[in-house]
């Protein structure tokens, strides 16, 4: 009996609790060449945008605090002189910071930290 209890205890000790995925917040670095305003997020594949903060001047970093069980998001920002720009399918569970870029031709991309 004691042998079975010890085996059960050893087996249960090796079982880890499942990891909880989700976003707890992240940083945004603006490298678009212009001021960014009106940051908003939506879950990738949906149409409902949620405002998550003001913005940042070129070269500045801002912190976004929010919590969500999902990971894949689209980020929208209004870039001064260039209108709304959207960066799609950002996995916010795997990154601490995103750097937004926009070149002279209007091409946008994001780098992850």
List each language-model region with its residue ranges.
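Bacterial N-terminal signal peptides that target proteins for export
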Residues: 1-7
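Bacterial N-terminal signal peptides
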Residues: 8-14
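Intrinsically disordered, low-complexity segments enriched in small/polar residues
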Residues: 18-66, 70, 78-113
